[in-house]
């Protein structure tokens, strides 16, 4: 059974595309045939983070418009077996995405035996975001531990509940997951950032992962490499933990405590 997962947020700049690339790579590393689709029409970025921008010949809109077949537009990742990228178009016409066109593409992907379809959604409520949500079975809501980001995520949860295909057909609701990015335990301890508990108290959806603030994320993006492939980075390890949880594997949350304060507490207990 193919899982269609939208990666979304209420605002831009929270690490949506970085997370889409990392999670898709992680699923493929786990043996799942995976495709990650860029729904951000006109602002194509996924191909840059995946390092395949020079290999784009046809795109999502070309397939929807019948100007190319799906196999011509799918880009096979050179580093990870079983991983494919479907890039967005650079067109400024946001209306180029249609329900019927997306439905045809998704039907073909299911028939091609893809296990996972990751939809990299644009931020907010533009048409690409709403359509990505409409077709999905699960939603990963990305937020930073900041009040404005969390507030915008609360709004997107309302959209998920009301606009999905599942809600319109009275099916079981979209399964919602929270992914907290750019988390800095030291800043949380200093009162400069919301804690995981604060965010969960506001959004009230299950926490699937906590990605720490890590310079390796920017470095990986600039190199066109999903950060999950940097096995020595904290962010890469946290994304692997997130993939495991999405596959039903229990693992503890790491990188959520201020290690300096934890060390001092242990020291004074002796």
UniProtKB/Swiss-Prot annotation:
* Disulfide bonds, paired cysteine numbers: none
Per UniProt, ATP binds at 11-18
The topology of this chain with respect to the membrane is:
Peripheral membrane protein
Looking up InterPro entries in the UniProt record yields:
CobQ/CobB/MinD/ParA_Nub-bd_dom, MinD, MinD_FleN, P-loop_NTPase, ParA/MinD_ATPase
* Pfam families noted in UniProt: CbiA
GO molecular function terms noted in the UniProt entry: ATP binding; ATP hydrolysis activity
Task: Give the keywords, sorted.
Answer: ATP-binding, Cell cycle, Cell division, Cell membrane, Membrane, Nucleotide-binding, Septation
The protein's superkingdom reads: Bacteria
Cell compartments where the protein resides: Cell membrane
Cellular component per GO, a single term: cytoplasmic side of plasma membrane
Among the GO biological process terms of this entry, one is: division septum assembly
Q: Does the keyword Chloroplast apply?
A: no
Subunit field text = Interacts with MinC and FtsZ.
Protein's job: ATPase required for the correct placement of the division site. Cell division inhibitors MinC and MinD act in concert to form an inhibitor capable of blocking formation of the polar Z ring septums. Rapidly oscillates between the poles of the cell to destabilize FtsZ filaments that have formed before they mature into polar Z rings.
**The family this protein is said to belong to:** Belongs to the ParA family. MinD subfamily.
Know the name of this protein?
Septum site-determining protein MinD
Task: Give the classification, highest ranks.
Answer: Bacteria, Pseudomonadati, Pseudomonadota, Gammaproteobacteria, Enterobacterales
């Amino acid at each position: 059974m193919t899982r269609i997962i939208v990666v979304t947020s209420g605002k831009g700049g929270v690490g949506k595309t970085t997370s889409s690339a990392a999670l898709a790579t992680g699923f493929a590393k786990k043996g799942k045939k995976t495709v990650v689709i860029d729904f951000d029409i006109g602002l194509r970025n996924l191909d840059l983070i995946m390092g395949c921008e020079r290999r784009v010949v046809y795109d999502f809109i070309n397939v929807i418009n019948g100007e190319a077949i799906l196999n011509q537009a799918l880009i096979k990742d050179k580093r990870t077996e079983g991983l494919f990228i479907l890039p967005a178009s650079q067109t400024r016409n946001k209306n180029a995405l249609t329900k019927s066109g997306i439905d045809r593409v998704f039907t073909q992907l299911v028939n091609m035996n893809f296990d996972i379809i990751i939809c990299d959604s644009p931020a907010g409520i533009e048409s690409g975001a709403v359509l990505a949500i409409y077709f999905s079975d699960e939603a990963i809501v990305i937020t930073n531990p900041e009040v404005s980001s969390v507030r915008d995520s609360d709004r997107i949860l309302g959209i998920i509940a009301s606009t999905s295909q599942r809600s319109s057909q009275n099916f079981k609701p979209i399964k919602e997951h929270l992914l907290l990015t750019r988390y800095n335990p030291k800043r949380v301890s200093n009162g400069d950032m919301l804690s995981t508990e604060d965010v969960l108290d506001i959004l009230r959806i299950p926490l699937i992962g906590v990605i720490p603030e890590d310079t390796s994320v920017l470095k990986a993006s600039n190199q066109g490499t999903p950060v999950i492939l940097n096995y020595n980075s904290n962010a890469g390890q946290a994304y692997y933990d997130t993939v495991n949880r999405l596959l039903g594997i229990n693992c503890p949350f790491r990188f959520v405590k201020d290690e300096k304060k934890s060390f001092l507490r242990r020291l004074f207990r002796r």
